[in-house]
């Protein structure tokens, strides 16, 4: 018998939770995941991440406190999540992009993103649950020494053009910006409480704008 899922993926707090709670419930209870088609996301993120390894924080942004990018691309697993003083059956598990060690010993958690849209506060609001999930795992690590996370944020690259010659090579041009998300652990725990109640409860209704559920419904009606 397959082991029952006992972890929450940080990205699900940003995407699935907001898009369709029914799809989230199916994924966590029956291991049914909607097919994804974003072949460039992984490679682009890896290229972006590689540019900041072992760099001083001033290389990323003048807004960051003194420190250095000390870790990247590592899997992190939290201890069981505690909600309202009660230990749940769930933990956080995922792979972060960049971790900064600041001069004061605290950590910064940075997620790398490539976009074609505006780099603004809406991006911070959208990705904050994901950032807080990684921060929670670092502060409540199952296998590593737990450390305080004093900052989270997004390193955004916006693709805005291309250049090059046929006899040489082509490359995309980007502008870049660091967007600080700060910390909001209380809001994160409140959200996780809702997520756990959802996946441990009855199957919810489809999201109003869930393209996957609409596709399944239309297909089922035909065949």
Give a label for each model feature.
Residues 97, 111, 130:
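Acidic active-site catalytic centers that drive phospho-/nucleotidyl reactions
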Residues 1-106, 116:
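Metal-dependent nuclease catalytic cores that hydrolyze phosphodiester bonds in DNA/RNA
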Residues 127-139:
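An active-site-proximal "capping" alpha-helix that borders the catalytic cofactor pocket
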Residues 112-122:
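Short beta-strand-loop-alpha-helix junction that forms the active-site gateway
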């Amino acid at each position: 018998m397959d082991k029952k899922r006992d972890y929450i993926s940080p990205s699900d707090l940003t995407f699935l939770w907001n898009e369709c709670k029914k799809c989230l419930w199916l994924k966590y209870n029956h291991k049914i995941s909607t097919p994804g088609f974003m072949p460039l996301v992984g490679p682009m993120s890896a290229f972006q991440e590689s540019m900041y390894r072992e760099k001083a924080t001033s290389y990323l942004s003048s807004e960051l406190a003194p420190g250095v990018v000390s870790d990247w691309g590592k899997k992190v697993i939290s201890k069981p999540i505690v909600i309202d003083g009660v230990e749940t059956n769930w933990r956080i598990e995922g792979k972060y992009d960049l971790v900064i060690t600041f001069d004061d010993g605290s950590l910064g958690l940075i997620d790398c993103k490539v976009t074609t849209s505006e780099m603004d506060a809406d991006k911070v609001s959208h990705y904050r649950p994901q950032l807080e999930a990684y921060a929670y795992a670092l502060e409540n690590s199952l296998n590593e020494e737990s450390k305080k996370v004093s900052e989270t944020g997004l390193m955004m690259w916006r693709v805005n053009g291309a250049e090059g010659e046929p006899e040489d090579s082509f490359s995309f041009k980007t502008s870049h910006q660091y967007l600080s998300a700060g910390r909001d652990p209380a809001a994160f725990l409140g959200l996780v409480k809702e997520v756990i109640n959802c996946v441990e409860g009855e199957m919810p209704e489809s999201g109003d704008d869930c393209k996957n559920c609409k596709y399944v419904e239309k297909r089922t009606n035909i065949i």
